[in-house]
Amino acid sequence: MENNLFKIHSDYKPTGDQPTAIDSIVKNIENGVKDQVLLGVTGSGKTFTIANVIERVQRPSLIIAPNKTLAAQLYSEYKKFFPENAVEYFVSYYDYYQPEAYIKTTDTYIEKDSSVNDEIDKLRNAATAALIHRRDVIIVASVSSIYGLGSPDTYRRMTIPIDKQTGISRKELMKRLIALRYDRNDVAFERGQFRIKGDVIDIYPSYMNNGYRLEYWGDDLEEISEINTLTGQKVKKNLERIVIYPATQYLTADDDKDRIIQEIKDDLKVEVKKFEDDKKLLEAQRLRQRTEYDLEMITEIGYCKGIENYSRYLAGKNPGDTPDTLFEYFPKDFLLFIDESHITVPQVRGMYNGDRARKESLVENGFRLKAALDNRPLRFEEFREKSNQTVFISATPGDFEVEVSDNHIAEQLIRPTGIVDPEIEIRPTKNQVDDLLDEIRKRAAKKERVLVTTLTKKIAEELTEYYIELGVKVKYMHSDIDTLERIEIIRALRKGEIDVIIGINLLREGLDIPEVSLVAIMEADKEGFLRSRRSLVQTIGRAARNVEGRVILYADIMTDSMKEAITETERRRKIQKEYNAYNHIDPKSIIKEIAEDLINLDYGIEEKKFENDKKVFRNKTDIEKEITKLEKKIKKLVEELDFEQAIILRDEMLKLKELLLEF
């Protein structure tokens, strides 16, 4: 295993309270502290701080972000900091994903439908390959990292080291490539394939941009080269040694195949008999037919569609055992950094239950063996058990993070640019729309941008239409806007094609925009999850990357949440201004280049939500029960800080209340 040192490449040195935060975190890691928090305000350089921590402690690191877009931003930043080291990207590789599901009430089976992004698949494979052969690895991941993967032991065991001196026969190489799930294709040469032309074998590894060429004389290996897969030209000649890693993490080793097939057959027999005993003959027939087809495929080629549902057998685990995940590919001393932990931790908490509910229906109706339930994300307690030493990163850490960190909290309130938290002004809600229009025009004249947050989608859309009629360059952004369109809207704002974004929850990805000098919060006194202390502090922070940053709260009363958010912001402003005065710092706005496509890695669209069949309400009682049910769900989502989903359910609940008036 290679053991290169982590080395930061940057023109900057830690400044402000970055050095103190770095020293504190490093000391806690070296002293074996399991959990700690980096409480860093927006624009304080938290990523640079963590990069310095990694360089100081020299340990492999996993950084988990709450979504693909933020993960892509972090990946780009860490790649620049560590060009000599293995910085990898591990997120869901689906451009589109409709999970397999069964709706019993309508007897509807929905087959898994997905589109895999080849580039992201390559990056995922590069991540696991890097962990096998080197220690200087940083992997930036989304919560996909807590989903089951194939066994790392099988993955390691099946890699193919090829040495020019000792060689490997053509027949043996082909056999092992097929076992590693490489397909032979002598016509179209794509990633995860190999081709044979006479005495030449070309391999296109699943984790590389280039490929390898092995030239034989009979069965004697004469030369190993790295090639351009498009032109076939040699990029590097006379390589002494290469290693071919698997094309996927889900593998069936030949010496395990008999065991795997027998275990599946045994479980199939038991589960079919149970259905037959319960007089569920359709389910019994369905399960037998589907599983026997999969068994035939595994027997012939070591693989079948949906093989992840048999991952428990592949890994040799017992029912209910914790699945192998990306965590198992790391050495035991790895570090875990959870970015935007106030969002990411609740996400991790909720993953298991959502996945379980969908799969139970498939198992109960004979579409899958019970083993499919073990192809799952980690439970939260399993996630915590697998996590080694953890640093939670957030401007507003959740109660859980603060509690488990036991006062090991490093505050980072000073920005390298000297920018202080924005001034907050409270204005009455009367005439708020026209008052805000004046403020928008002032900012637009100075080529500055504005973010506006409302309480509902309807208000966001109506306000946008009203301002467009008055000549304002504005767009709205809410949960109906898909990931790619969100990215384009943000990019348009940064480039000045629009001056204003109006949205509901402006805490989501990509909204740390230096050009924004005003954040307006409409109806700030409507106490609720979108106007909680934590939400307000986060939203206020959106104006903290511009030296002219201001926040207007439109409110007629002072809520507890407003008071707490304003008090916290004033505390930070005081510390920041004192630091600037003492060090003679003149604040400067953050300068951030506008990428051509903002994030060229984020081709992906978030997983499509699975919708139940529409309910039919026959009386007022049915509607009232559904409203009560939704209220409980909303409360739970708010506790988990899943505001986007809470908003969707809140809107559903409002429609039901309108429907109730019609009875």
UniProtKB/Swiss-Prot annotation:
CDD domains cross-referenced by the UniProt entry: DEXHc_UvrB (cd17916), SF2_C_UvrB (cd18790)
Domain UVR: residue ranges: 624-659
Presence of keyword ATP-binding: yes
Short sequence motif Beta-hairpin: positions: 93-116
Gene3D superfamilies, per the entry: P-loop containing nucleotide triphosphate hydrolases, UVR domain
Residues where ATP binds: 40-47
Domain Helicase ATP-binding: 27-414
GO biological process: nucleotide-excision repair, DNA damage recognition; SOS response
Domain Helicase C-terminal: 432-594
One Gene Ontology cellular component: cytoplasm
Subcellular compartments: Cytoplasm
Keyword DNA damage: yes
Molecular functions per Gene Ontology: ATP binding; ATP hydrolysis activity; DNA binding; excinuclease ABC activity
One Pfam family, short name: UvrB
Keyword annotations from UniProtKB, A to Z: ATP-binding, Cytoplasm, DNA damage, DNA excision, DNA repair, Excision nuclease, Nucleotide-binding, SOS response
Subunit annotation: Forms a heterotetramer with UvrA during the search for lesions. Interacts with UvrC in an incision complex.
HAMAP family: UvrB
Role description: The UvrABC repair system catalyzes the recognition and processing of DNA lesions. A damage recognition complex composed of 2 UvrA and 2 UvrB subunits scans DNA for abnormalities. Upon binding of the UvrA(2)B(2) complex to a putative damaged site, the DNA wraps around one UvrB monomer. DNA wrap is dependent on ATP binding by UvrB and probably causes local melting of the DNA helix, facilitating insertion of UvrB beta-hairpin between the DNA strands. Then UvrB probes one DNA strand for the presence of a lesion.
Classification via NCBIfam families: PRK05298.1, uvrb
Domains (record comment): The beta-hairpin motif is involved in DNA binding.
Protein name: UvrABC system protein B
Taxonomic source organism: Fusobacterium nucleatum subsp. nucleatum (strain ATCC 25586 / DSM 15643 / BCRC 10681 / CIP 101130 / JCM 8532 / KCTC 2640 / LMG 13131 / VPI 4355)
Organism lineage string: Bacteria, Fusobacteriati, Fusobacteriota, Fusobacteriia, Fusobacteriales
